[in-house]
Swiss-Prot record:
Descriptive protein name: UPF0434 protein WIGBR2520
Classification lineage: Bacteria, Pseudomonadati, Pseudomonadota, Gammaproteobacteria, Enterobacterales
Family designation: Belongs to the UPF0434 family.
Domain of life, source organism: Bacteria
GO cellular component terms attached to this protein's record: cytosol
SS bond list: none
Pfam families: Trm112p
Organism of origin: Wigglesworthia glossinidia brevipalpis
InterPro entries reported in the protein's UniProt record: Trm112-like
């Protein structure tokens, strides 16, 4: 994931910073405990595409 992109995108639910999970290849919002998939290198930042994750 491009670091420049990570600096400008935000969670579409709460507008907080997203983190990239290198192992799972997804974007994580720690505040909302949700993940957003990345398909073909494109982050899918739609509320309906998010899924819950366990608090880490």
């Amino acid at each position: 994931m491009d670091k420049k992109l990570l600096n400008i995108i935000a969670c579409p639910i709460c507008n907080k910073k997203l983190n990239f999970d290198l192992i799972r290849k997804e974007l994580i919002c720690e505040f909302d405990s949700v993940a957003f998939p990345i398909k073909d290198g494109i982050p899918i930042l739609l509320r309906d595409s998010s899924y819950p994750i366990k608090k880490r």
